[in-house]
Regions:
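Domain-level signature for soluble enzymes in the chorismate/prephenate branch of the shikimate pathway
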Residues: 1-272
Length: 272
């Protein structure tokens, strides 16, 4: 089984892939979410792991559009606690460090810690990639922010642990595929959808009332501008349910009240 991840081995995406699918998988490394979406859309992997939101930094909005624009399907989700650590080439003193480098999302999640340093903050494409580069090139003036898996895999020394601003730092990942038939959920109880509404007063409230009347629990709503139409928005939602039949009835009714509805996937709620 081929599973694509954003980043390289030792990254948080790699950890999710191993925990979700097990160790007997072939990992395909992608250095950007765009590359990940392209690889999945082209059918070069069976599944892909994509971070979608974080409890500190919020939604990764471009990733919603990548799933939508590439007609990808969400077949599962996974949550992990993110514990960021500062790591250096073995033996290097923190006072000798000039730069601290990591993925922009990791830097944002460690904002309070970074404010207290006099180091130059450098954005990079992946947490684990920075760690690997430090080791491969014997870089001694740069520290990486990454997970413990990266430190262990690339032989770096961890000098500060759990440097994220909020200690309960959780990230939600979705498991995506090109084909809906690759779904691995037998009894789905969560769905991800997109809908577009007209500019009528109360149109959004009407949709929310339909969901509530069918016993659907809205767990996420994210508005995203429609580029071609200024000041018009599409809504991406996650909803949980206990009765699949009532869910389908609700979506049928929502479709009649919306300009368009698109279902990205039904799957098992990780939190249930």
């Amino acid at each position: 089984m081929k599973v694509a991840i954003q980043g390289i081995k030792g990254s948080y995406h790699h950890r999710v892939a191993l925990e979700f699918f097990g160790k007997e998988i072939d990992i395909l490394e992608c250095l950007s979410f765009d590359d990940l979406a392209d690889l999945t859309h082209e059918g070069k992997c069976d599944y892909a792991i994509m971070a979608i939101e974080n409890s500190i930094a919020g939604s990764i909005i471009p990733n919603y559009s990548l799933i939508d624009d590439n007609d990808l399907h969400i077949i599962g989700e996974y949550f992990i606690n993110i514990n960021h650590n500062l790591m250096v080439y073995p033996g290097v003193d923190f006072n000798k460090i000039i730069n601290i480098s990591s993925h922009p999302m990791a830097l944002l999640q460690c904002k309070d810690f970074l404010k207290k340093t006099d180091k130059i903050i450098v954005e990079d494409r992946d947490t684990a990639q920075v760690a690997k580069r430090i080791r491969d090139k014997n870089i001694k003036d740069t520290a990486a922010i990454a997970g413990l898996e990266a430190a262990e895999m690339y032989g770096l020394e961890v000098i500060k642990t759990n440097i994220q601003t909020i200690k309960d730092n959780e990230t939600r990942f979705v498991v995506i595929s090109k084909s809906k038939s690759k779904s691995i959920s037998n009894n789905p109880d969560k769905a991800s959808l997109k809908f577009i509404l007209s500019h009528r007063n109360g149109s959004l409230a009407n949709i929310l009332n339909i969901l509530a009347s069918h016993d659907l629990n809205l767990t996420k709503i994210q508005s995203i501008p429609i580029i071609e139409t200024p000041w018009k928005y599409s809504f991406f939602i996650d909803t949980t349910f206990s009765n699949y039949k009532k869910y389908k009835e609700a979506i049928k009714k929502v479709s009649s009240q919306s300009e368009m509805v698109k279902e990205f996937g039904v799957y098992n709620n990780f939190k249930s």
